[in-house]
Design a protein with these regions (language model features):
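C-terminal substrate-binding/catalytic lobe of Rossmann-fold NAD(P)-dependent dehydrogenases
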Residues: 134-138, 148-315
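Rossmann-like NAD(P)(H) cofactor-binding subdomain of soluble oxidoreductases
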Residues: 86-153
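N-terminal Rossmann-fold NAD(P) dinucleotide-binding loop
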Residues: 14-15
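Rossmann-like NAD(P)-binding element
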Residues: 52-112
């Protein structure tokens, strides 16, 4: 099946996403667009020289005209986070970049599904929804899908259990106000606290889980990686690839991605991550999972923090 995917931004994240796409079967055509023509041509040259080891695929360094009629568009453009910066620190600069990109790509690919990866991703998703004219159902922010993966990795390591058996999630902003709704955490249907009791009795683990330390690991991992190597891109690319897989599958999936809220948990007019139904038609809606009173308060606080930043921006 012919499927065109456009990646806007050929920085570390965009180039790695394009490379990951070139290894799979989600796309038959990949267009990579970047303001730095020499950089994008170099990235594409590096990618295409490895495509002889797979079934034929088209990968080009293009412009917005080449992105016409894309099935999926991934936006990664923006200034990258530096060590010690929060994602919110990037807001106005990257908002200005998004305001420039959105009308250009929307004009040539009005029917595409859009995956927003640029940080701060919840704000960038909101801005794209407000300035592009694209229906909200076609717009998905990568949100906390990576945070959820980091959480599951940490729990997998702690309990020596495959990540696919862990059902635990990160909600809220992809950033400092995110939280873990522990009331939802299970391992193969067993509440996490009960599973941990069993693991302690069997000496699989000796230390009890510290919820605050676990949340700190999830929230600070990105910053630690940036401090050590300058940027994060492998796990980000893997998480985006997971989203793309859901968008081309025969059935819908549920993932913690960012999309516009319309009264869920009492939250309006902000993009934030809760369990969201996504599939070939984009966003179908939010799964109305019951949260505790404290968890609902944390979600609303996260939404309010994002709204406060949005109110200060020139959108």
């Amino acid at each position: 099946m012919s499927r065109k995917v456009t990646v806007i931004g050929a920085g570390n994240v965009g180039a790695t996403i394009a490379y990951t796409l070139s290894l799979g079967d989600i796309a038959s055509q990949i267009v990579v667009v970047d303001i730095n023509r020499e950089k994008v041509e170099g990235e594409v040259m590096d990618i295409v020289q490895g495509t002889s080891f797979r079934e034929p695929i088209s990968v080009i360094a293009g412009d917005y005209a080449d992105a016409a009629d894309s099935d999926i568009v991934i936006i990664t453009s923006g200034i990258g986070r530096k060590a010690g910066q929060s994602r919110i620190d990037l807001a106005q600069t990257n908002v200005n970049i998004m305001k420039d990109i959105a009308p250009k790509i929307a004009a040539v690919a009005p029917n595409a599904l859009y995956v927003i990866v640029s940080n701060p991703v919840d704000i960038m998703t909101y801005v794209f929804a407000r300035v592009s004219g694209i229906p909200e159902s076609q717009i998905i922010g990568s949100g906390t899908i990576l945070d959820t993966a980091r959480l599951r990795y940490d729990l997998s390591h702690r309990y020596h259990i495959a990540q696919k058996n862990i059902h635990a999630y990160v909600y809220g902003e992809h950033g400092d106000t995110s939280f873990i709704p522990w009331s939802l955490a299970q391992i193969s249907g067993c509440p996490l606290s009960e599973y941990e009791d069993m693991m302690v009795k069997r000496n699989v683990t000796k230390d009890r889980l510290d919820p605050e330390q676990t949340l700190k690991y999830v929230q600070k991992s990105g910053g630690e990686i940036i401090a050590k190597k300058g940027a994060t891109f492998y796990a980000v690319s893997a998480s985006v690839n997971k989203i793309l897989g859901a968008l081309v599958a025969a059935y819908d999936s549920v993932a913690t991605v960012s999309s516009m809220m319309h009264g869920e948990y009492g939250i309006e007019d902000v993009c934030i991550s809760t369990m969201t139904i996504i599939g070939p038609n984009g966003v179908k809606g939010k799964v109305p999972v019951e949260l505790t009173y404290d968890e609902q308060a944390k979600l609303r606080a996260s939404a309010d923090a994002l709204k406060e930043v949005i109110a200060s921006l020139d959108i």
